Amino acid sequence: CCMKSDKKAVWGWALYDWANSAFATTVMAGFFPIFFKQYWSHGADVNVSTAQLGFGNSIASFIVALMAPVLGAMADKGSAKKKFLVFFAYLGVLMTAALFLVQKGQWGWAIFIYAMGIIGFSGANVFYDSLLPAIADEEKIDYVSGLGFSVGYLGGGLLFLVNVLMT
């Protein structure tokens, strides 16, 4: 086979996307906006809560846009890709778990913690993506990338379904 590494490395890389996409589908696209509007922004006018959510997403996106070139350069030149991947992934996981502690009406804390979760998620993605050339030869890189993408959609979709069934 043309893999630089064994199948275990390829599947390990792909299965990271399984968990990673679960954050995107369940937290970012699915439930955070609903919980934000109905719980953390309790009592706020719908236009105000929409503006607050938009502001939070914009600030997080702006910070990610500022960080991405620096993190990308670190990923391209550095040898600590896995350490940075783990750091940012843990940041995302811890911030997502911390949302449990945010009380009703505390929209500011919810936005701050959510934004930190997005920074963790996005920062981890930079280093996750940078690992692909290390596990796949150039002629197999599309296949391995597609494997991660498809496994990610499957994982994200399954968790989203489980979460919907829980509500």
Residue locations for each model-derived region?
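Central cavity-lining transmembrane alpha-helices of secondary-active solute carriers
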Residues: L53-A73, G157-F160
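Helix-loop boundary and gating motifs at the non-cytosolic
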Residues: K4-S61, G108
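C-terminal ends and interior cores of transmembrane alpha-helices
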Residues: A65, V86-Q106
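Cytoplasmic helix-loop-helix junction between adjacent transmembrane helices
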Residues: I113, I119-S150
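Cytoplasmic membrane-interface "Motif A"-like loop-to-helix N-cap segments
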Residues: A75-L91
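Short hydrophobic/alpha-helical segments at membrane-entry points of transmembrane helices
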Residues: Q106-Y114
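Helix-to-coil boundary motifs at intracellular loop junctions of multi-pass secondary transporters
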Residues: Y39, K77-G78, L131-A136
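Glycine-rich segments within core transmembrane alpha-helices of 12-TM secondary carriers
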Residues: Y143-T167
